């Protein structure tokens, strides 16, 4: 399958699909942190190419509840509305298989409830971080390796230049589940 991983600079999910033989491409305005097929551009430049599946990880800064204390400012300066419209590019995309990943946030009210909320500890990582998935044409992900030792590590990260990137990166176990389960869809 030809798969677009939108707003993914880590390459984690792209690489999981590529390892299973898929023609997977990541796209982000930043360069990819791992070698592989990557478009470094605004995703709108490639979004309407001929894709069999689109998995999107739109920026959550203006949408997630953990940033709610700044919502008034984000509404006033237009950032939140731009982020909503960007999210909806993926929700309204004509591809038959679409997944949109974002933390718990306002899209559950403005768009619709997510199809599922997963936790890293369901996929081999002893951490908590509720992650919503809105799906079309794809099955719910089944847990692959439920582990104990659940810590909210990402919520306790110290401020720093790498914090946002590390908090938003997809866990390897989740990426592998997406590839192994959705790669057959």
What are these regions (language model features)?
Residues 1-185:
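Conserved active-site and SAM-binding loop architecture
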């Amino acid at each position: 399958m030809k798969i677009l991983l939108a707003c993914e600079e880590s390459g984690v999910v792209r690489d999981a699909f590529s390892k299973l033989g898929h023609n997977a491409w990541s796209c982000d305005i930043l360069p990819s942190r791992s070698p592989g097929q990557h478009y470094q551009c605004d995703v709108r430049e490639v979004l309407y190419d001929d894709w069999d599946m689109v998995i999107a990880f739109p920026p959550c800064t203006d949408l997630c509840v953990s940033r709610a204390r700044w919502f008034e400012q984000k509404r006033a300066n237009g950032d939140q509305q731009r982020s909503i419209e960007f999210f909806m590019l993926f929700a309204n995309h004509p591809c038959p298989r679409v997944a949109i990943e974002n933390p718990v946030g306002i899209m559950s009210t403005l768009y619709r409830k997510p199809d599922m909320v997963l936790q890293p500890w369901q996929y081999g990582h002893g951490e908590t971080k509720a992650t919503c998935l809105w799906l079309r044409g794809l099955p719910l992900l089944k847990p692959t390796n439920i582990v104990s030792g659940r810590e909210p590590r990402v919520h306790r990260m110290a401020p720093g230049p790498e914090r946002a990137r590390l908090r938003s990166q997809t866990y390897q176990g989740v990426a592998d589940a997406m590839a192994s389960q959705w790669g057959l869809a």
